Each structure stands twice: as C-alpha cells, then as structure tokens.
C-alpha cells in the first residue's frame, strides 16, 4: 500500500538549509509499525524563485544525501536568476536523509514535490487491524459516556434486535431477488430454445419446398420431352401418309374416294393404323426414360449446379438425387454429396 502527500519548503537568506528526514516518531498514523516496514520517498517536481528575489542575483541550491554505498554526497542541484530563469522543473526521486542548502544568493527559493510512503503487506494488515480496534474503542466510549441519556442506553438491545430483524429481512429479500433472477434467466433460455426450434422448422420447410419444387421441375421437363416426342411421331405419321398417297397404289385410293359408301372403310383402315403408331410412341417414351436413368456423374453435377433448389442437408440431398436422377447406389450418392458440400464451402 502507498500513500502520497504534497511536500513544500523554502530557502531564504536567514534559512539557508532545509532537512528532510521523516521518522515514525513524527507519524501518529504509524505508531505500531516497524521502521523496516515503511519507506519514505521524496519526488522533487519544481523550484521557483520568489517575488522578493534580488535582480541580477544568482541563487544556487545544493543537495546533500547518501549514495548507494552509504557515503555522504554533495551536488549542486539547480541555479535560478531573476529575469533569466525564474523557475526550474525537476524530476528527482530521493530517500531520506536529505538536506537542501542555498549556497549562493539570498532567495527566496521555493521547493515543491510529492512525499510518498510505501507500507509492506504485513504492516498494512496491522494498520487495518489497529484502525478497526480504534473504531470499536470509540464506539464503546460513546456508548459508555455519562452525558448520554439513560433511556438511550436501555434501548440499545432493542435496536440490536431490530437490526437483526432488518438484516434477516434484507437477506430474505436478497434471496427472493436472486431466485427471481434465476427464474427470469430460465424463462429467457426457454424462449431462446423455442425461437431456435421455430427457425429450424422454417429451414426444414424451406428445404422441403425446394425439394418438392425440384421434383415438379423434373416432372415438367419429362412431360415436355414426352410431348416433343409425340409431336415427332405425329410428324413421322404425316410423312408416311404423304408417301402412301404418292405411291403407285394411288388408283386404289382414287377408287375408294369415288365410292362414297366405302369412305367409312377407308377411315376404318386409317384408324387401324393409328394404334400401331401410338404403340411406337409408347416404345420411344420407354426408351427415352431408360436413357434418362443412365446419366454420368459429370452430367448430374452439371444439372445440380444449374439448379437453385438443391437441398443443403445430406439426407434431403440424397432423396432429391434418388428421385430426380434415379440413382440408388449408396457410393454414388455419397460421392455426389461430398462434391456438393465442397462446392458450397468455396
């Protein structure tokens, strides 16, 4: 522990020396401390020439103290002159004993600084105990003073019981307050858990919607491809009909046209050919679907990169790939998932 105090003194023509050597005998606050447990330091900060100094007179101040070896040392500290340099900043820390001497001039020269007292940890505890004992003694003296009314001394035990009751009540209030804080914290934690659970549910719903949206897109693509194949089959049928009309068997069709009664037969013949065309179309669709199932991993990766509705969770991703690309092999699914997860981290 350390304490700091302001320090100041002056040197004049009649007071040429100032000694600084504080001791425990002069300190009322440290009566019970050892001299080894306390240290004094003086930090000089400023030297100022007084207003009554003589013009043109040089004032020289010398310091006398002990060095590390315990030898006596004398050294000029500063020099002041009115009109030239009337003050001098200082930054010197010294320990007692110290003597300041005005070796030249008549002053006045004013010294100022900081007096710091360092107290060891053991002595600090003793000092605190002494302070507590003094406070208790003061309270006892006040209570035992004859100047106090008798009624007050009689009421003291009651005040003590009241104080105990107040302390008990305060302790109970503190306990209730702590319990209430704990309850509030638990409620806050529960609310946070509920919010997090709701957020997770929302994310799952979004992933499900994305997955369903991806399946719908795939089904639409398949329907469009089927429609395109149907259109191609219809075009092929029309071309075949055109070729039949241009073939050498044209007189037979002309005869059929001449006889109106046989139009139904001709229509029936054309109708008999249509189911065969439809069967061809179904065969082509089956072949087209079979080709779709056999997709290379690079093609699947390309489609996944183009799609914006791919789920970002492993299980949903695998379900999506199974449904969209008809892949059931666990190794391929795991490879695709590893590639997709790496692409997300880029």
Swiss-Prot record:
One of its GO terms (cellular component) is nucleoplasm. Gene3D superfamilies: 1.10.10.2100, Nucleoplasmin core domain (2.60.120.340). GO terms for biological process: chromatin remodeling; mitotic cell cycle; oocyte maturation. The keyword Signal does not apply. Signal peptide: none annotated. It is found in: Nucleus, Nucleolus; Cytoplasm. The keyword Repressor does not apply. Residues 171-180, 271-285 have a biased composition (Basic and acidic residues). Pfam families: NPM1-C (PF16276), Nucleoplasmin (PF03066). The modification N-acetylserine is found at residue 2. InterPro entries: NPM1_C, Nucleoplasmin, Nucleoplasmin_core_dom, Nucleoplasmin_core_dom_sf. Keywords: Acetylation, Cytoplasm, DNA-binding, Glycoprotein, Nucleus, Phosphoprotein, RNA-binding. The modification Phosphoserine is found at residue 145. One of its GO terms (molecular function) is RNA binding. Residues 123-285 are annotated as: Disordered. Expressed specifically in the oocytes of the ovaries. Glycans are attached at residues 85, 264. Phosphorylation occurs in oocytes during the progression of the first meiotic M phase. No phosphorylation is observed in immature oocytes. Belongs to the nucleoplasmin family. PANTHER family: GEO09167P1-RELATED (PTHR22747:SF18), NUCLEOPLASMIN (PTHR22747). Binds double-stranded RNA and both single-stranded and double-stranded DNA. This is Nucleoplasmin-like protein ANO39. It comes from Patiria pectinifera (Starfish). The lineage of its organism: Eukaryota, Metazoa, Echinodermata, Eleutherozoa, Asterozoa.
């Amino acid at each position: 522990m350390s304490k700091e105090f302001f320090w100041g003194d002056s040197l004049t023509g009649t007071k040429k020396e100032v000694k600084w050597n504080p001791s425990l005998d002069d300190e009322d606050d440290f009566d019970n401390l050892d001299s080894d447990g306390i240290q004094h330091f003086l930090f000089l900060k400023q030297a100022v020439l007084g207003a009554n100094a003589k013009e043109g007179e040089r004032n020289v101040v010398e310091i006398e103290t002990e060095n590390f070896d315990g030898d006596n040392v004398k050294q000029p500290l500063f020099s002041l002159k009115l009109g030239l340099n009337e003050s001098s900043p200082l930054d010197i820390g010294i320990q007692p004993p110290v003597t300041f001497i005005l070796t030249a001039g008549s002053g006045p020269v004013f010294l100022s600084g900081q007096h710091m007292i360092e107290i060891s940890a053991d002595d600090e505890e003793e000092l605190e105990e002494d302070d507590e004992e003094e406070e208790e003694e003061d309270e006892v003296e006040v209570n035992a003073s004859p100047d106090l009314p008798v009624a007050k001394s009689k009421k003291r035990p009651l005040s003590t019981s009241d104080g105990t009751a107040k302390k008990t009540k305060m302790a109970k209030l503190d306990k209730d307050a702590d319990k209430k804080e704990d309850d509030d914290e638990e409620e806050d934690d529960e609310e946070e858990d509920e919010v997090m659970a709701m957020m997770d549910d929302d994310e799952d719903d979004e992933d499900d919607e994305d997955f369903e949206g991806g399946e719908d897109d795939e089904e639409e693509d398949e329907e469009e491809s089927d429609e395109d194949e149907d259109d191609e089959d219809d075009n092929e049928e029309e071309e075949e009909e055109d070729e039949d009309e241009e073939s050498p068997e044209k007189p037979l069709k002309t005869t059929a046209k001449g006889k109106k009664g046989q139009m139904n037969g001709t229509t029936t013949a054309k109708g008999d050919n249509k189911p065969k065309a439809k069967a061809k179309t179904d065969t082509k669709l089956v072949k087209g679907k079979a080709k779709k199932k056999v997709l290379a991993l690079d093609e699947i990766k390309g489609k996944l990169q183009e799609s914006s509705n791919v789920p970002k969770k492993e299980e949903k991703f695998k379900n999506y790939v199974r449904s969209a690309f008809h892949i059931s092999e666990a190794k391929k699914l795991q490879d695709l998932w590893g590639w997709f997860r790496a692409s997300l981290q880029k």
